[in-house]
Design a protein with these regions (language model features):
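Bacterial Sec-dependent N-terminal signal peptides
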Residues: 1-30
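Short active-site neighborhood of thiol/selenol oxidoreductases, capturing the structured segment around
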Residues: 183-206
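A generic structural micro-environment signature
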Residues: 7, 15, 61-66, 176, ...
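Oxidative protein folding and maturation machinery
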Residues: 27-172, 177-178
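Short amphipathic alpha-helical segments with coiled-coil-like heptad repeat character
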Residues: 2-4, 120, 181
Length: 208
């Protein structure tokens, strides 16, 4: 599944649903948001409910719905934005609820695997968020019936995207200074180091 359209913009409907006592109903061409109970008063409780029940009204078996970018793709964009606002436990529970439903059918699984890659793995995505991606990957890894190859692939991605997250100790690696001399980050344990990361194939980057 290719995504050639511009990245959708995150909407404010989710925060509205968390903060106000509103009921969001499914309408034609709109994502079928869950109804957040008015008895849930705090933003934390509303956020938790919305995350876990976000996909309750979505029909993962509908091919036409899966192909509707205004509904499915934008709904997924809003969901990953929602995950980024949660504590780790709530995010994991919400991701588990999503994966259980989304990966029960092959077409749905293929659609959301592609969307996850497009928005959370693509370096050009303004929504790229390794921490959120790892939450989803771990939920995918907990699924039953995975082949050894699928497990290995998910394990590799979890290790890769789970490294050097905010708040973690940076993994040791080699870098080259402006004179072409090679160093390791561990050589500067008690010093501050300013590193410039760039694409080796980017000609303009080499000129900076």
């Amino acid at each position: 599944m290719k995504h050639n359209t511009p990245f959708p913009i995150r909407l404010g409907l989710l925060l509205l649903a968390m903060m106000a006592s509103v009921v969001l109903h499914a309408q034609g061409g709109q994502f079928p948001f869950p109804s957040v109970p008015s008895t849930l008063r705090t933003p934390e409780d509303r956020l938790q409910y919305l995350g876990i029940h976000y996909w309750d009204r979505f029909d993962f078996r509908s091919q036409s719905l899966l192909a509707d970018k205004d509904v499915t793709e934008q709904g997924f964009v809003n969901f990953i934005d929602l995950l980024s606002r949660m504590d780790s436990l709530t995010a994991a529970r919400s991701a588990d609820a999503f994966v259980t439903k989304a990966f029960a059918q092959k077409q749905s699984a293929d659609t959301f695997t592609s969307l996850s890659h497009h928005y959370l793995e693509n370096p050009q995505s303004p929504l790229r968020n390794d921490a959120v991606y790892v939450v989803l990957l771990r939920s995918m890894r907990r699924r039953k019936g995975l082949t050894p190859t699928q497990r290995q692939g998910l394990d590799y991605k979890i290790r890769t995207f789970g490294s050097n997250l905010p708040g973690q100790r940076a993994a040791d690696f080699q870098f080259v200074d402006r004179r072409g001399k090679h160093h390791r980050l561990s050589d500067y344990r008690h010093e501050r180091v300013l590193l410039f990361f760039y694409d080796p194939d980017c000609d303009n980057c080499h000129r900076i």
